[in-house]
UniProtKB/Swiss-Prot annotation:
Belongs to the CTU2/NCS2 family. Transmembrane segments: none annotated. Plays a central role in 2-thiolation of mcm(5)S(2)U at tRNA wobble positions of tRNA(Lys), tRNA(Glu) and tRNA(Gln). May act by forming a heterodimer with NCS6 that ligates sulfur from thiocarboxylated URM1 onto the uridine of tRNAs at wobble position. Prior mcm(5) tRNA modification by the elongator complex is required for 2-thiolation. May also be involved in protein urmylation. InterPro entries: CTU2, Rossmann-like_a/b/a_fold. This is Cytoplasmic tRNA 2-thiolation protein 2. It comes from Eremothecium gossypii (strain ATCC 10895 / CBS 109.51 / FGSC 9923 / NRRL Y-1056). The keyword Chloroplast does not apply. Keywords: Cytoplasm, tRNA processing. It is found in: Cytoplasm. One of its GO terms (biological process) is tRNA thio-modification. It comes from the Eukaryota. GO terms for cellular component: cytosol.
Length: 461
């Protein structure tokens, strides 16, 4: 079967009911990527090569090209790796056409201490083998997630037992991100907290390094998954901010934009691109899908892939499983979800003061504690008989009762001196599942530059 684009080469895969050869398909993905890169005037000024004109001199144009810095959060999954490869192609084409480039790229690779050696090996291979031609304008940084939180101020967040109010106190306890995540019993909550921590560090790095655009490697499948997951978790108010690619990120000083250049590309298409571009050897902790290829080379692997039990899956994994099932035949379902969600506006706040959640750093529009208090019974039923009173006194005199009463009294004493710690509804629900409704969580105000600098990969290493 011939490729429908060039009509000369043999087709190797089918996507969106169209047959592609490898070269035409790679071009198809590249064009969708470029379209999002140049979506508005701001992005055009960041990505294109600037020359002297009536607005700037040649020296000013060169300086602006150097100051056009974009940040790529790299997970070494298929999406972020494909995006970095497409960016590298763009830089190479600019260098060939203009003998210069229009922007600089900073790449941040986050991982836990146990994964650092393998991540560094893959990053060094990627830098020397795939990015060597543009090594002067692509710099890679490794960030140890555990070490990044070991030096910052830690707050203990407390959730009230009776009215769902929240407070925070400073604590001298040392914490790594791994120990913070261990406070949660459910994988879904741990994944949420890991994403909030990773996102905060990336955006903090962007605000400290004059970054103009953060390029997130989310496919349209991942974005649809994220939209549905936010609704399920009670975080629907965050959808508008999550998908906003036009406004500046006000939570971090309105210094940069968040861009999703692969938002028109399906995850299966990104996986196919990685296979065609021979990026498999750089992928970490992810298996490529081969569902689009006419002669799939990994049919056996796909057939033997273990399907986890639903009760062991996170909310994101459950929604991803659904979208994986419908992506091939009903891809319009996925794009419709993202397109509809992109039309949502920011919620209207009840007050004039701008308040941010102490955990996820998203804006709080309505105080969830007041709403929860209005729909729940918050007080225990009092003893109704002498027998009830006798049983209560027996419990109070028991070791378990004394321990509980002492803990509640200590918590009450702390509560009276603790500071306000606003939480969004989703984080109230998450904090409610922790032991004693307490959570050690890092302060937003800390500098990640020192930790990043220690792991910067340079040409000499």
């Amino acid at each position: 079967m011939k490729c429908k684009r060039c009509t000369t080469s043999e087709g190797c895969l089918v996507s969106r009911n169209e047959t592609f050869c490898g070269e035409c398909f790679s071009r198809f993905v590249l064009l969708k990527f470029r379209k999002q890169m140049m979506m508005d005037e701001y992005c055009q000024q960041v990505f294109k090569v600037l020359y002297a004109d009536k607005h700037r001199t040649a020296v000013e144009a060169d300086e602006q090209n150097k100051r056009s810095v974009v940040l790529v959060p790299l997970s070494l999954g298929s999406s972020s790796l494909a995006m970095l490869d497409l960016l590298n192609q763009t830089l190479s084409e600019q260098r060939a056409a203009h003998n210069r480039t229009g922007f600089q790229v900073k790449v941040v690779l986050c991982g836990f201490s146990a994964d650092m050696d393998e991540l560094k090996r893959l990053a060094e291979s990627l830098q020397t083998e795939r990015l060597a031609m543009n090594s002067d304008c692509i710099k890679l940084y490794l960030l140890d997630l555990d070490r990044s939180f070991s030096t910052c101020e830690i707050h203990k967040l407390l959730l009230a037992n009776d009215n769902h109010g929240s407070r925070k106190i400073a604590t001298r306890e040392n914490a790594t991100l791994s120990s913070i995540l261990d406070q949660f019993s459910r994988r879904s909550s741990r994944d949420d907290m890991l994403w909030f921590a990773r996102q905060h560090l990336i955006k903090k790095f962007a605000s400290q390094h004059q970054v103009k655009v953060i390029m997130w490697g989310h496919s349209v499948t991942r974005l649809a998954d994220e939209v549905m997951s936010l609704v399920i978790k009670g975080r629907g108010a965050q959808i508008a901010a999550t998908l906003d690619s036009t406004g500046m990120d006000v939570e971090y000083g309105a210094l940069f934009k968040n861009l999703y250049p692969l938002r028109d590309v399906l995850l299966s298409e990104i996986d196919a691109y990685c296979s065609l571009s021979k990026l498999q050897r750089y992928i970490y902790n992810y298996s490529l899908q081969g569902s689009l290829f006419i002669k799939s080379q990994d049919e056996a692997a796909q057939a033997n892939r273990a399907v986890p039990m639903a009760k062991n899956m996170t909310i994101n994994e459950l929604t991803r499983q659904y979208f994986d099932a419908v992506e091939k035949d009903y891809s319009n379902v996925i794009s419709t979800i993202v397109r509809t969600a992109s039309k949502l506006d920011y919620p209207i706040s009840n007050g004039t003061e701008v308040i941010y959640c102490s955990i996820c750093n998203n804006r709080v529009y309505v105080d969830p504690s007041k709403w929860l208090k209005s729909i729940t019974v918050n007080n225990c039923h009092p003893p109704a008989s002498d027998e009830d009173m006798s049983m209560l006194q027996m419990w109070e005199s028991s070791s378990k009762g004394k321990e509980t009463l002492a803990r509640n009294q200590a918590r009450s004493n702390i509560w009276s001196t603790a500071a306000e710690a606003p939480l969004c509804y989703g984080c109230v629900v998450t904090l409610n599942e922790t032991k004693d409704r307490e959570l050690n969580w890092p302060s937003r105000e800390h500098d990640v530059s020192q930790v990043l600098a220690e792991f910067t990969l340079t040409d000499e290493e």
